[in-house]
Amino acid sequence: MKCLITGGNVKVLGKAVHSLSRIGDELYLEPLKDGLSLRTVNSSRSAYACFLFAPLFFQQYQAASPGQDLLRCKILMKAFLSVFRSLAIVEKSVEKCCISLSGSHSHLVVQLHCKYGVKKTHNLSFQDCESLQAVFDPASCPHLLRTPARVLAEAVLSFPLALTEVTLGIGRGRRVILRSYQEEEADSTSKAMVTETSIGDEDFQQLHAPEGIAVTFCLKEFRGLLSFAESANLPLTIHFDVPGRPVIFTIEDSLLDAHFVLATLLEQDSCSQGPCSPKPHQPVPQKQAHSTPHLDDFTSDDIDCYMIAMETTGGNEGSGAQPSTSLPPVSLASHDLAPTSEEEAEPSTVPGTPPPKKFRSLFFGSILAPVHSPQGPNPVLAEDSDGEG
């Protein structure tokens, strides 16, 4: 494989790599007849991104040498990102970029031709790999939003950098709402600040979604996508369904196509505070192998099996984690077998997902009979024998 990129397209390629670096730690490079594909996926398989650069994007493009099969490789994202670390320098000094991949060499060669005849050559180690492909279909999503990326990029500027997730929904008057999502804690006494941005439907080229629908997804990957789309001055299309189904972001142009697929949080309860205030969720990009055991399964005398079954129930019903995280392991300490205080023994109405310890108390309290300790000392059934007599 050999391709040559010139002019401003070098910066476009660098911007794409920066967007991909916000998702995964590995870059999958695959030359195709339709163009050069750059893909990545995060470690939890809850976010996937793909850029396909058409042959017209390059001044020269050769997917494979005559008589040779198409090659594909996997590279460390940090290594490839180092080539385009400073986009300002790339824009000012780099005139063209040549990327070559050969089966007879053990390196991916990226050569930057700079001003004044300076050449920078990067030999990047790679591994052979299978093709990375996510299964998704934007046409299957009933809801669609299409707007210039600048509109959404300006909207997310109001959110703090430390914010993990954002909720996108349709409010009253068909206004698009972006709201910061904070997972509620059972023992939280102070409410965190909530930021909400409202955008009128006149700023959208297409808006096909009913009022009240809302999905929550990770903001970090969304920022990276908006950064690329805004710099390329391209519109962004959002395909989404009900909470729990992935949201698909697409960018289409004659020179490139981009697809970002992000997992959304699943609603466990009905929303009562509007379309953009979802209740606790759990990610569903991966099929869960565990299922909620029947109550009869808890009557086993084997305490290990009992704990495993209970832990599975707590993981399925009490998960309220982010798309890229999972429920922390359940502690098997002996003091968790029964409530240790009056607050734990009495069930209370708590908004949000109760912590795992609360679930342990409720599950055991519903299966095991409560143990009441007598108020006074235990009665003496037999007195101590007199050792001297």
UniProtKB/Swiss-Prot annotation:
Keywords of this entry: DNA damage, Exonuclease, Hydrolase, Nuclease, Nucleus, Phosphoprotein
Q: Note the Gene3D superfamilies from the entry.
A: 3.70.10.10
The chain's coiled-coil residues are none
What tissues contain this protein? Expressed in heart, brain, spleen, lung, liver, skeletal muscle, kidney and testis.
Chain segments carrying region Disordered: 271-296, 312-389
Q: What does this protein do?
A: Component of the 9-1-1 cell-cycle checkpoint response complex that plays a major role in DNA repair. The 9-1-1 complex is recruited to DNA lesion upon damage by the RAD17-replication factor C (RFC) clamp loader complex. Acts then as a sliding clamp platform on DNA for several proteins involved in long-patch base excision repair (LP-BER).
Protein name as it appears in the record: Cell cycle checkpoint control protein RAD9A
Q: Which organism is it from?
A: Mus musculus (Mouse)
Taxonomic lineage per UniProt? Eukaryota, Metazoa, Chordata, Craniata, Vertebrata
Gene from which the chain derives: Rad9a
